[in-house]
From Swiss-Prot:
Ranges for region Disordered: 359-421
Subunit-structure text: Component of the large ribosomal subunit. May bind IPO9 with low affinity. Interacts with RBM3.
Gene expressing this chain: RPL4
Classification of source organism: Eukaryota, Metazoa, Chordata, Craniata, Vertebrata
Cross-link (Glycyl lysine isopeptide (Lys-Gly) (interchain with G-Cter in SUMO1)): 361
Residue numbers bearing the Phosphothreonine modification: 266
Originating species: Canis lupus familiaris
Protein known as: Large ribosomal subunit protein uL4
Length: 421
């Protein structure tokens, strides 16, 4: 399978190259922006929604009134009457059985979304650019292993087909019938409530046929499941990128393929069929940075490489870090030492002054002066001080004289206790 080329071969209805070539339109080289495609698809798809809402009377078609406080039950309105299970049950609230929903839906919701025209065109250009990349088309699930070329262009004679068998024969000759067989094999029952809402069956997407004029081509291809037919002048992003995912398999007619340059422009020439529009530009024309940096011609366009390494220095607080402070102010060490000495000197002066005042006061009362007591550290609780060993005369005086030991008397035995016979 060939890749995207500047010249695209045109294939006949027999599946062979007709010998004619078509220049690849510039729109196939447009920037690929899946984010824009997804955004535009999401917003345009919202325009097909049908308004819905619950009834305004739902949950309120009963007579209920709150019992008030003092009954040890919630203050929710309760159904009146008796003789039935319903009486006394809560009503109206969204937490009650049979009550209304929270924030009932209204039909005046903002259902539709407006999308900028330029943004819609950008999305279509990106979706068209993906049609020429086999990897993206295959990742979407299309069976294009045997397709001769992408984009696949056929002669304009196909636009005059009116019979289904002619369309089947063409798809088989172009090796695109495998994609239709995939659709047949994927038909299955929908999971969920959609089965009850006229959406019973689902299936995969098949190829998209893009034509210029309808001379019967719609009747020929419309019977096959999964096939979508689009006019090249009315391309739809919902059909080109189903689900907001780029890469759908498309088959073009020759006249439709040639018309793309007039519809979207070529960068050098604006679009002739649109007013004041040209293709979006790429952010980078060449993404190979190594090639750009090593380009020999015109090196002045590039800034000279920065060879000097600027290392970030961790700034430490000199008020907390003495080493950094000494770098900034070497005299700081001397200042600190002088401050400590001055504080010690002042403390000594205060103590001497207090001692002198106490001595003068004691002399007035006739009591010899005492030195002022200093603060002692807190005593530890539960710790006994070890006793100092007593040495010298005190030790001899404190020792008690040993009592004279008497010889131990022997206790009489049982035989001695017996009286002599």
């Amino acid at each position: 399978m060939a890749c995207a080329r500047p010249l695209i071969s045109v294939y006949s209805e027999k599946g062979e190259s007709s010998g004619k070539n078509v220049t690849l339109p510039a729109v196939f080289k447009a920037p690929i922006r899946p984010d824009i495609v997804n955004f535009v698809h999401t917003n345009l798809r919202k325009n097909n929604r049908q308004p819905y809402a619950v009834s305004e009377l739902a949950g309120h078609q009963t007579s209920a009134e709150s019992w008030g406080t003092g009954r040890a039950v919630a203050r929710i309105p309760r159904v009146r009457g008796g003789g039935t299970h319903r009486s006394g049950q809560g009503a109206f609230g969204n937490m009650c059985r049979g009550g209304r929903m929270f924030a009932p839906t209204k039909t005046w919701r903002r259902w539709h979304r407006r999308v900028n025209t330029t943004q819609k065109r950008y999305a279509i250009c990106s979706a068209l650019a993906c049609l020429s990349l086999p990897a993206l088309v295959m990742s979407k699930g299309h069976r294009i292993e045997e397709v001769p070329e992408l984009p696949l262009v056929v002669e304009d004679k196909v636009e005059g087909y009116k019979k289904t068998k002619e369309a089947v024969l063409l798809l088989k000759k172009l090796k695109a019938w495998n994609d239709i067989k995939k659709v047949y094999a994927s038909q299955r029952m929908r999971a969920g409530k959609g089965k009850m809402r006229n959406r019973r069956r689902i299936q995969r997407r098949g190829p998209c046929i893009i034509y210029n004029e309808d001379n019967g081509i719609i009747k020929a291809f419309r019977k096959h499941p999964g096939i979508t037919l689009l006019n090249v002048s009315k391309l739809n992003i919902l059909k080109l990128a189903p689900g907001g995912h780029v890469g759908r398999f498309c088959i073009w007619t020759e006249s439709a393929f040639r018309k793309l340059d007039d519809l979207y422009g070529t960068w050098r020439k604006a679009a002739s069929l649109k007013s004041n529009y040209n293709l979006p530009m790429h952010k980078m024309l060449n993404t190979d940075l190594s090639r750009i940096l090593k380009m020999p011609r015109d090196p002045r366009a590039l800034r000279a490489p920065r060879k000097k390494i600027h290392r970030r220095v961790l700034k430490k607080n000199p008020l907390k870090n003495l080493r950094i402070m000494l770098k900034l102010n070497p005299y700081a060490k001397t200042m600190r030492r002088n401050t400590i000495l001055r504080q010690a000197k002042n403390h000594k002066l205060r103590m001497d002054k207090a001692a002198a005042a106490l001595e003068a006061k004691s002399e007035e009362k006739g009591v010899p002066g005492k030195k002022p007591r200093r603060k002692k550290g807190k005593k530890t609780v539960g710790v006994k001080k070890p006793k100092k060993p007593v040495v010298g005369k005190k030790a001899a005086a404190t020792k008690k004289p040993a009592a004279d030991k008497k010889p131990a008397e022997k206790k009489p035995t049982t035989e001695e206790k017996k009286p002599a016979a």
